[in-house]
Amino acid sequence: TLSVAGMSAGDILENLPGGIKVKAYKSTDEGVSFLVTTADGTTIYHAGDFNDWHWQDESTEREARVADELFKKILNRIASENDRINIAMFPVDVRQGSDFARGAKLFLKAIKVDDFFPMHFGGDYKEACDFSEYAESPETTFHCLHKPGETVELR
């Protein structure tokens, strides 16, 4: 039986079943983001609602600057502790208009990612899938899931 534990940014749960370790990082919105490390050292990052949440097309210059500064501060912390992440799930939210992929692009510039999964795109699979065509991260494999429950086997 596994007990449930609430986590705050900075918390680390170690020695979980199967040798799993979980670290929580701050978010720019609700909750936290998580880095899971498996017993074999594989790292899996789930951003939750961590993103560069500003709408360049709608935000004031000040709102955009504040959102960008907070995002970069948290991203720098994550990057300082993780130069490479094997699997990352990160928001690519088309509601943000022209900036819908900004946070993901900055994340991929700061941290080497082997396999990237866009999320938080509200069913707009085309936009999420198009992201991989212009992301500047040649060492990253981009995976697009086209329906809920779809799986991908990684090697």
Language-model segments: residues:
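Binuclear metal-ion centers of metallo-dependent hydrolases, dominated by the metallo-beta-lactamase
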Residues: 2-14, 100-155
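Core dinuclear metal-dependent hydrolase active-site scaffold
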Residues: 4-84, 149-155
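Structural recognition of the beta-strand scaffold that forms the well-ordered cores
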Residues: 45-46, 86-90, 116-118
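Conserved protein kinase catalytic core
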Residues: 55, 97, 126
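A short, acidic, amphipathic alpha-helical segment used as a generic capping/interface helix at domain edges
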Residues: 72-78, 97-106
